Each structure stands twice: as C-alpha cells, then as structure tokens.
Amino acid sequence: MLATLLSARIRGDIAVAAARALFEAGLRDARSMADATWQQRVDALGRGGYRRYDERTSTILGKSAALVLDRYDGDLRRLREEPDPKKALLDIPGIGPTGADIFLRDVQGIWPEFAPYADPKVLDGARRLGLPASPEELGGFVAGRDMPRLADGLVHAALDKHLAEEVLAAAEGR
C-alpha cells in the first residue's frame, strides 16, 4: 500500500500520513481494502492529507487489492515465489518502477533472497558519497537485515546534495 502511495507525484510525508490513515481506518490488508467501499478509501486518504489524487488512488487501491487476492490469495509473501518479483510487482495497479524499487528496497531486510537490492536511486547516492555503485559491494558493508537502512540513507544522499556534503565532511573529520 505504501509503495502505491509513494509512487504518486506527492510528497513522501503525505503518502506516509495517508498510509497511516488507511491503517487507522482498518484498511490493513488486501481483504479489508477490497471489502471497503470506494468512498471509505477516499475518506481515509483525505484524513491523511492525500487529497489531490484521492479518488484515482482509491480506485487503484481497490484494483490492487483484488489482484493481490486473486494472484496471491491476499498474501504478498507469495511474491517470493515469482521468478521476477519486480516484474510481478509492476503488474499490480498503481505500482510503477519507483514503487517496485521502494518495495524491494525495504523488504530485503526480511526476505534475504532479495538482498542486496540497490535500485538506481540507491546507486546514485552511493556514487555521490564515493561508495561502490554495485549492490553486491554495498551489501558487503552491512548485515542483510540492515541493507534497507543503508539503502534508505543512500537515497537521502542522492536526493539531498547538502546532506551528502555533510556526510562526506564528517567522514573526513571536518
């Protein structure tokens, strides 16, 4: 759900607040999302501040839930059985390349067969900090369960030049 929300052209903090509002409304899994009415999803998204795309996103969340129920019996852990999990994620309505990358980046900490996963944004951050730009080399720096944290930090470095400069200065002892 969060990957779908983060895939839209909306600020990350609003997407996270909307995910929290959906969760608080009891829309916590594919079954509850599919069982909710379109309006219930719109209302929950609105409470989370997700207003610009709320109607479209409500429809997408309903379709996504239906696909997850049909293909995975409501259990995304079955995605682990897919020969190409990123391609399978892209089949889910509302999940684009960015959403698939976010999902795989975060889930690798609990699904070790996906680690080390480093998408282009992670690799951009690694290059900006002078680190190796290969998933395997980056994965060698941390335990598998910590790879999502490293990846998230590198994404922040990719998106925020000043943060990257601060990290580099701290590493040099300035």
Regions found by a protein language model. Give the residues of each.
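A short secondary-structure junction motif
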Residues: A3-I14, R51
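A positional/architectural concept
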Residues: V16-G26
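Short alpha-helical scaffolding segments that buttress acidic/His motifs in well-ordered protein cores
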Residues: M1-L5, L45, L61, F103, ...
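C-terminal accessory module of base-excision DNA glycosylases/AP lyases that mediates lesion recognition
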Residues: P97-R174
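Alpha-helix N-cap/helix-initiation sites
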Residues: R11-V16, R31-A34, D54-S58, P97, ...
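Structural motif
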Residues: I10, R51-R56, F141-R149
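Alpha-helical ds-nucleic-acid-binding substructure associated with the helix-hairpin-helix region
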Residues: A25-P93
